[in-house]
């Protein structure tokens, strides 16, 4: 997981989406057309630390990337920590 996007187990999903857009060489305008919404709304999404699951699913499908994996890893780490 990208440590600059995580803070003591807290996931900032907006930053992770933004980083993936850059890796994929996709623009905010492209994502806005895919999900569909305005560019301004996408910029707001990128600033948000958490998102509604339905919106995250739309983004994951549009970008063909499973953003839920970050949450699954975070839960797995917490369970491992708890069980020792």
Where are these regions (language model features)?
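A short, Lys/Arg-rich alpha-helix, primarily the initiator
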Residues: 1-26
């Amino acid at each position: 997981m990208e440590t600059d996007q995580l803070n003591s187990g807290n996931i900032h999903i907006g930053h992770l989406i933004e980083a993936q857009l850059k890796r994929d060489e996709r623009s905010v305008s492209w994502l806005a057309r895919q999900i569909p919404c305005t560019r301004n709304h996408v910029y707001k999404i990128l600033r948000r630390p958490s998102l509604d699951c339905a919106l995250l699913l739309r983004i994951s499908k549009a970008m063909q990337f499973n953003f839920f994996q970050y949450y699954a890893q975070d839960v797995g780490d917490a369970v491992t920590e708890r069980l020792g």
